[in-house]
A protein has these predicted regions:
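PLP-dependent enzyme catalytic core of the Aspartate aminotransferase-like
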Residues: 151, 167-193
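Conserved glycine-rich beta-strand-loop-beta hairpin in the small C-terminal domain of fold type I
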Residues: 99-109, 121-135, 145-148
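Short, small-residue-biased leader/transition segments that mark boundaries at the very start
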Residues: 1-2
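Active-site PLP attachment segment
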Residues: 26-61
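Conserved Walker B
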Residues: 8-10
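Active-site C-terminal subdomain of aminotransferase-like
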Residues: 57-77
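Short hydrophobic/aromatic beta-strand micro-patches
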Residues: 53, 133-135, 178-180
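Structural signature of PLP-dependent enzymes
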Residues: 63-66, 87-109, 139
Length: 193
């Protein structure tokens, strides 16, 4: 039986560093890791194709149990994606996406750094993924920060939204999560506001 499950979230978007090897790749074809991923961030959320790479020793059991299973994604979409990948188009697409998202990230970090006094803001998580963390030194209460950002047309996901202690919106917001996959004014225009 497998012992580890790896969800390779945003691994294809590393900007200033080399990609990390997957646990499944390091463990080998028959290692104890089941690798899970999706195309929703790298291609489009609407495609809704996820995949898993099973260790070889689990393949017979998988085929026996799920050979008649019909997924929710049509065979046409699956085969189209397979040809997109095997034809090298996916690799080229990811290279273009990395350049585009790196430019967005750079514009966003420049705009954020310009908007705060030195020492008031520290950004982390810049080297990978489609998000970053903004550490605010003298942060207003979470609800006030969220309202001010929304008034400017900026959608923030605050880490306190995921706080299980219940302190939520009354606590200071030392951290907020900013995603580069927004559907609003492009980041390069933020600095002009």
């Amino acid at each position: 039986m497998y012992k580890r499950q790896e969800d390779d979230y945003d691994s294809e978007f590393r900007f200033d560093t080399r990609p990390l090897p997957s646990l499944q790749g390091m463990a080998g074809a028959d290692g104890p890791v089941v690798y899970l991923s999706t195309c929703s961030r790298s291609l489009a959320p609407g495609i809704r194709i996820a995949y898993m790479v099973l260790p070889e020793h689990l393949l017979p059991a998988w085929h026996a149990k799920y050979r008649l299973y019909s997924g929710t994604v049509s065979r046409f979409e699956q085969q189209t994606l397979a040809r997109f990948i095997t034809g090298g188009y996916f690799t080229r697409h990811l290279a273009r996406e990395r350049v585009a998202y790196k430019a967005r990230r750079d514009a966003l970090t420049a705009a954020l750094n310009a908007a705060f006094a030195p020492g008031e803001l520290t950004l982390t998580g810049l080297h990978t993924g489609l998000h970053l963390l903004a550490h605010l030194r003298n942060a207003p209460p979470d609800a006030a920060l969220h309202a001010a950002a929304r008034a400017q047309g900026v959608r923030l996901s605050l880490l306190s939204d995921y706080d299980l202690t219940g302190s939520g919106s009354t606590a200071p917001a030392p951290l907020c999560w900013v995603t580069a996959r927004w559907r609003m004014t492009p980041a390069h225009r933020w600095a002009k506001r």
